Amino acid sequence: MEFILTFDDKVIRFINDNMRSRFLDKAMKLVSASGNYGIVWIAAAFSLIAMGGEKRRAGLLMIASLMVEASACNLIIKPSVKRVRPNDAHGLVISIDRPKDYSFPSGHTAAAFAAAYSLYLSNKRSGIWMLYSAAVMGFSRVYLLVHYPMDVVAGAVIGMLSAGFVHRKSSK
């Protein structure tokens, strides 16, 4: 566990000291903001639902995956783990509004991967592109200093497990 905490701290310090740029600041803020409250993923799901047919089913499964992920992260894991965010732990200045909840796991990343993996399970060709966007979402949260790398990894795993669970249950 100590190795993970040390690794997380080193990555955060490296990003803060070496990777800052105006372009990345703006780009990562835009990426991160698109995931606020899961808006982009919910919009994608409702777009699929509106298309009907198999796409409707994919959208409904995406919504269900997001609900499972959000419940796991926000109602169970974050309140249990209570990990302080890196900007608060290290006194770092951040360029977005200061999040008020805990750091572990990354909810933005969990939602992104729940939606993306759900789509991937329904349609691999479309889903692979959404998985790439989910990875960028995760990076944005570390870049903006509001999550540690392991928060993002855990969010990705929880999101994918949530989608896998929903898809397994729906096929029975």
Language-model features, listed with the residues they occupy:
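Membrane-helix interface segments
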Residues: 23, 54-58, 123-129
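Interfacial segments of alpha-helical transmembrane regions
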Residues: 45-71
